């Protein structure tokens, strides 16, 4: 069946290349609206496959609109950002770009496909290339760090003090990160040193007092320090009228709020299978026969491949079906077992070459539409490769996204074909523009 999908993908690629490159610019919003309609309709689809309502069943044909919504979203946001007068530094324009990204994510989450929805965060890499402040990416990374450390080390305590290592570490990081942001974005080294000095100094003093004098939970001291830090930043906002202080204050408040809501999200918002996967990834649970089975078997398969592998179709772990999803989400473990380190490295080098080529082609576009779309394609490919390989190696959560052009499945193959070949057609049209 995969041969059929490959053949139809070649035909699709040919059709895409035959269309005028201006077609994709002209009908970007229409394509986006059509895919949003399909995503919305899929939520009410009675056909549930593997616990997901993300499939449209048309007779013998089964398609996932979420895979096609990626290129539609890329076209729509490229159209928006290439309009005259668009300025990403303006909040109204930035909010419009975010809305285009978030809207399909909402519909996809409604289909119980959280993993596919997370792919759309990759578009923020494109926004960063087009001028979005790096503080947004920093905030996202910081929240991930808070979540991991706060959940992973919630139980262990510091020495004999009734203080959680996770809570202590996260609140200390909030104080340090806030000081660093004041230094970098406000160019105010004195305020940064004041915040850092008081917070770290009092925290260390409280730690020593609790260890050698009276044991107590020093998290309360840290919370008081964070409140004082926020109050001081508010004073700077009112006194100096510098808006950067306001955003840094929001970062501090948001960090604390996010951290204390992480446990609630894990236990009450996430689905049971998602919660177990995260606990297994963080080492809080050992479920080798359940949620951790695929990852454990894929690690065995890759490790057993050695340097040169066992040979094509000679993998024992994959051939004997120890890895259930070896043709789709975990196909990289098949490469690792059969072709070894050499084959795995070769595949990763091919993806690296593709990503570097996409950067080169995107940068040479004469119009903003082509450049933005190119970086959308690049971001999606980068996210898929990083997360897919990471989850096979047990480094990232298992969220069920395919490896581009490797994993079995027609929807993903068609989706990546649309993504890449539309960009090739846009690039081919640049020479016509220059002549």
Regions found by a protein language model. Give the residues of each.
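Hydrophobic alpha-helical transmembrane segments of multi-pass inner membrane proteins, especially
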Residues: 1-289, 333-391, 418, 422
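Glycine-rich, flexible loop/turn motifs
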Residues: 45, 52, 59, 274-277, ...
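Glycine/serine-rich anion-binding loops at beta->alpha junctions
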Residues: 60-69, 111-112, 306, 398-417
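Transmembrane alpha-helices of multi-pass inner-membrane enzymes
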Residues: 177-181, 394-431, 435
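Membrane-interacting alpha-helical segments
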Residues: 304, 368-373, 428-432
């Amino acid at each position: 069946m995969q041969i059929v999908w490959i053949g139809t993908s070649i035909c699709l690629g040919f059709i895409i290349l035959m269309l005028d490159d201006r077609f994709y610019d002209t009908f970007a919003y229409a394509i986006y609206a059509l895919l949003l309609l399909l995503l919305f309709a899929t939520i009410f689809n009675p056909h549930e496959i593997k616990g997901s309502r993300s499939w449209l069943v048309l007779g013998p044909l089964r398609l996932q609109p979420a895979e096609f919504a990626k290129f539609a979203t890329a076209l729509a946001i490229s159209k928006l950002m290439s309009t005259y007068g668009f300025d990403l530094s303006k909040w109204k324009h930035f909010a419009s770009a975010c809305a285009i990204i978030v809207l399909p994510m909402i519909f996809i989450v409604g289909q119980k496909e959280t993993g596919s929805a997370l792919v759309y965060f990759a578009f923020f890499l494109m926004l960063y290339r087009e001028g979005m402040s790096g503080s947004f990416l920093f905030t996202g990374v910081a929240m991930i760090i808070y979540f991991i450390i706060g959940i992973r080390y919630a139980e262990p305590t510091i020495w004999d003090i009734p203080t959680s290592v996770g809570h202590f570490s996260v609140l200390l990081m909030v104080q340090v990160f806030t000081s660093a942001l004041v230094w970098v974005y406000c160019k105010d080294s004195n305020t940064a040193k004041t915040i850092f000095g008081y917070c770290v100094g009092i925290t260390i003093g409280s730690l020593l007092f609790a260890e050698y004098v009276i044991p107590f939970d020093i998290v309360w001291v840290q919370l008081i320090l964070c409140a004082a830090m926020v109050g001081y930043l508010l004073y700077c906002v009112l006194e100096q009228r510098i808006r950067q202080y306001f955003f840094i204050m929001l970062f501090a408040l948001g960090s604390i709020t996010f951290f204390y809501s992480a446990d609630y999200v894990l236990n009450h918002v996430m689905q049971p299978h998602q919660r177990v996967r995260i606990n297994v990834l963080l080492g809080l649970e050992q479920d080798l026969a359940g949620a951790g089975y695929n990852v454990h078997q894929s690690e065995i398969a890759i490790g057993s491949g050695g340097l040169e592998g066992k040979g094509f179709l000679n993998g024992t772990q994959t051939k004997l079906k120890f890895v259930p999803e070896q043709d789709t989400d975990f196909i990289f473990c098949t490469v690792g077992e059969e072709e070894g380190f050499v084959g795995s490295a070769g595949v990763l080098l091919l993806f690296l070459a593709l990503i570097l080529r996409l950067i080169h082609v995107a940068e040479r576009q004469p119009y903003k539409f082509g450049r933005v779309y190119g970086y959308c394609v690049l971001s999606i490919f980068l996210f898929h490769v990083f997360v897919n390989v990471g989850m096979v190696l047990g480094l990232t959560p298992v969220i069920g996204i395919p490896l581009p052009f490797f994993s079995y499945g027609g929807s993903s193959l068609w989706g990546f074909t649309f993504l890449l070949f539309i960009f090739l057609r846009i690039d081919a049209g640049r020479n016509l523009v220059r002549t």
